[in-house]
């Protein structure tokens, strides 16, 4: 998101978001701040989908701590993905009667209904995602098969990335 050199890397993050949520993109907002350069050094993008899901992407080249984090909000869940640390957290909200799990917390909502919040930290395979995508593309050519990321999926992710970049330079 920050600077044109980061657009390619962030396109992969956008592709993941578009894969997680198949709903159409309804609205994109983005803002950035230039602090040490003529282009945004810190940027935030918000992608709103027609089904109500919202994805927030944050990127900074001057943060004290390197960060590439995506947060996805939907009606009954919150998903946080830290691409640099390879951490993935899922928080789901269910009715209390559905079940209780070890990593859960019972809370009351504003209507007095008891809900169960489940916390999950799925294991993330430590791979170089760009290298894996290039290998998949190579194998699809070699074996004359479809790649995991279709041309249309790649174009959609690139269109979203380009819209974010356009909004950052308005």
Regions flagged by a language model, labelled:
Residues 9-34, 46-53:
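Oxidoreductase and adenylate-handling cofactor-binding alpha/beta cores
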Residues 31-33, 50, 59-62, 75, ...:
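Histidine- and/or cysteine-centered catalytic micro-motif in compact active-site loops
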Residues 35-39, 63-65, 80:
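Short glycine/serine/proline-enriched coil/turn segments at secondary-structure junctions
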Residues 50, 132-170:
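C-terminal helix-rich "cap/oligomerization" subdomain common to oxidoreductases
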């Amino acid at each position: 998101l920050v600077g044109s050199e980061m657009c390619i890397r962030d396109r992969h993050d956008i592709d993941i978001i578009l894969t997680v949520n198949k709903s159409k993109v309804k609205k994109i907002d983005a803002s950035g701040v230039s602090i040490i350069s003529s282009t945004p050094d810190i940027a935030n993008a918000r992608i709103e989908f027609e089904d109500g899901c919202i994805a927030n992407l944050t990127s900074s080249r001057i943060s004290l701590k390197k960060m590439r984090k995506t947060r996805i909000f939907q009606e009954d869940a919150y998903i946080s993905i830290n691409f640099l640390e390879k951490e993935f957290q899922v928080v789901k909200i269910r009715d209390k009667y559905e079940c209780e799990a070890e990593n859960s917390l019972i809370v009351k909502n504003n209507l007095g209904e008891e809900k169960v919040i489940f916390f999950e930290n799925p294991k993330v395979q430590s791979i170089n995602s760009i290298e894996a995508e290039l290998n998949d593309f190579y194998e699809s050519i070699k074996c004359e098969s479809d790649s995991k990321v279709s041309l249309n999926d790649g174009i959609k992710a690139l269109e979203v990335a380009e819209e974010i970049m356009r909004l950052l330079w308005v």
